[in-house]
């Protein structure tokens, strides 16, 4: 076993009893060999390596999208003949969160490091497509594909200090407040869930990145064959335990849990989350942590007990520029209201960090 990430996770998994299922999230879909290695010693609560390889293959994903009646952007696996005017994106095949995506331009094509790209299949060239960044969340089990919902994805938002193509959050409306546009989009996306379950034998939670054009055209961009960072918002909106759904769909009986106080779902609310990135090297001191926790307690009470901040950094460190600092949540009466409340909170936290 190789040392370092991601193979160090295999060593960590080996420390658990063999009966404990292995479960993973992003971006281990890019390491199917590791997933297979872990599954040799324990049951797997998720998709095996062969499913990951197929769903991460743009050729196979294009076929699935087309058969489900959805569009897929022109995608090439070699730079030969690709226009160098920015109309195509250079995308790592083993990417996550939008990292490493760049417009394919003359200057980038002239970079001598791209000789390495031609020697191996590590990148794809995908036509830049216009549309609202969105995602579909599926819960798949044999014969029972289910669309949990659709989310608006936040990508490259300047108020999060995110790079142009970096994922930085999501907005979700529960079915109780979703309008006709959401219902039409859901109807368009249901056939894809059937293809994912039947053709690929995918199980558990699966996310699909989409672009939705103003005329309603839905373009599939990428598959994430594991629980995604947007899905916890569905739990806040009344979809039940996301982890529980995933385990059950993968064939595992849910363990009995002791009663505990937890926030009530808010089916009448829309929920939003954002990842705030560091605009510059950001020192983290204990007084800052204390102030964040104090503010979080206020917002958490406003949001019915649901945590308003997550991934709070440890003290005595410096967060590098462009690295994630903290995750922020907000609820609202509509998507627009939730998003505005989220932006207000991000601005407040940003000022606390000294990034404003």
Q: Can you annotate each of these PLM segments?
A:
Residues 127-130, 134, 138-195, 224-248, ...:
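ATP-dependent carboxylate/phosphate-activation module, predominantly the ATP-grasp catalytic core
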Residues 1-50, 67, 313-314, 320, ...:
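ATP-binding N-terminal substructure of ATP-dependent carboxylate-amine bond-forming enzymes
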Residues 247-356:
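Peripheral (often C-terminal) accessory segments that flank ATP-dependent C-N-forming ligase machineries
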Residues 197-232, 276-280:
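Conserved metal-phosphate-binding beta-hairpin within the catalytic cores
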């Amino acid at each position: 076993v190789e040392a370092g990430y991601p193979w160090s996770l295999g060593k960590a998994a080996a420390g658990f009893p063999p009966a404990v299922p292995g479960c993973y999230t992003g971006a281990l879909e890019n390491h199917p060999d590791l997933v297979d290695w872990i599954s040799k010693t324990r049951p797997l609560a998720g998709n095996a390596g062969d499913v990951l390889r197929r769903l991460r293959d743009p050729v196979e994903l294009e076929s699935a999208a087309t058969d489900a009646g959805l569009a897929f952007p022109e995608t090439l696996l070699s730079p030969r003949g690709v226009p160098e005017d920015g109309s195509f994106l250079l995308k790592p095949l083993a990417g996550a969160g939008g990292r490493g995506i760049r417009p394919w331009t003359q200057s980038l094509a002239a970079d001598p490091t791209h000789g390495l790209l031609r020697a191996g299949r590590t990148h794809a060239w995908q036509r830049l497509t216009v549309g609202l960044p969105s995602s579909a969340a599926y819960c798949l089990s044999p014969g029972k594909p289910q669309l949990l919902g659709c989310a608006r994805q936040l990508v490259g938002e300047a108020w999060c200090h995110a790079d142009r193509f970096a994922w930085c959050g999501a907005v979700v409306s529960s079915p109780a407040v979703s309008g006709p546009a959401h219902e039409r989009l859901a109807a368009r996306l249901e056939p894809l869930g059937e293809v994912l379950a039947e053709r690929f034998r995918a199980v558990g939670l699966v996310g699909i990145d989409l672009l939705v054009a103003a005329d309603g055209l839905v373009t599939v961009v990428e598959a994430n064959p594991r629980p995604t960072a947007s899905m916890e918002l569905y739990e806040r909106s009344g979809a039940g335990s996301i982890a529980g759904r995933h385990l059950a769909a993968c064939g595992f009986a849910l363990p009995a849990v002791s009663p505990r106080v937890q926030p009530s779902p808010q089916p009448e609310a829309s929920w939003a989350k954002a990842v705030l990135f560091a605009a510059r090297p950001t020192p983290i001191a204990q007084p800052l942590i204390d102030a964040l926790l104090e503010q979080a307690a206020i917002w958490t009470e406003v949001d019915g007990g649901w945590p308003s901040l997550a991934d709070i950094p440890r003290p005595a460190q410096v967060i590098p520029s462009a690295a994630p600092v903290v995750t922020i949540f907000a609820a609202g009466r509509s998507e627009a209201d939730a998003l505005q409340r989220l932006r207000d909170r991000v601005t407040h936290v940003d000022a606390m960090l000294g990034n404003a």
